[in-house]
Amino acid sequence: MLRVWQERFELADALISFQDVALGYDGIPVLEGLTLDIHRGDFLALVGSNGCGKSTILKSIAGILEPLRGRIRRGAGEKPVRFGYVPQRETIEMVFPLTVFEVALMGTYGRVRAGWPISHADRELVRTCLADVGLADLRRKPFPALSGGQRQRVLIARALAADPDILLLDEPLSGIDLGAAQTIMELIARLHRDHGLTTVMVSHHLKALRERQVVREVVWVHEGKLLRGPAATMLAPDMVFRMMDADIG
């Protein structure tokens, strides 16, 4: 059964396809010659040393950063791909007194025409998304008053409110304690399992990825190249040592 499932997705057009892509800033490339396909149902983790370009790749998948050279194709047909993007928590401005519900509601803004009210259906969707991440009872609480793990779950709910084809998460385990990190990993795994949500996450928490065993494939960003394979193989201690000259225990 697993082989049939794999063959079906191998034959399908990729949702995202990098074709000899160069990425960089101010016209200066930091990554070149990238080839990467993401199919519906994939669950990938982008890993590598600090500054290797993991977040740059994630932003380019979402269309936030366009390539300097090459082509990134988004969508397997005429219908555009919808993204749910979870940035690093440090990028969220904390001075505005927004509630949990109001932050999650931002995920619907891409579907709302300027000057039009948010529909009842979208508000109900946001309530469902907050329930999915276990925060329905906190929807009226100020966002800055939450713990780090709770804030991260709100940002995931906001991404889900975009009704995405692909969920993109940039360091979702960063800056939270071990218990909260386990909760976040279990949540991401459940969303992928229950909804078939294509998921790509950036993480430097290699030990957590290996121990939780929820990511299907890992893509190492190493010396400007991409190396992709099954999670069990790519997170094995000998592979980690080769890629980072470090042991994860």
Locations of regions flagged by a protein language model:
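Conserved ABC ATPase signature
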Residues: 142-146, 150
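H-loop (His-switch) and adjacent beta-strand-loop-beta switch element
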Residues: 213-230
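Helix-to-loop junction immediately C-terminal to a conserved catalytic motif
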Residues: 62
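Catalytic Walker B motif of ABC-type/P-loop ATPase nucleotide-binding domains
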Residues: 167-171
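Conserved ABC ATPase "signature" region
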Residues: 105, 120-138
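Conserved catalytic motifs of ABC-family nucleotide-binding domains
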Residues: 163
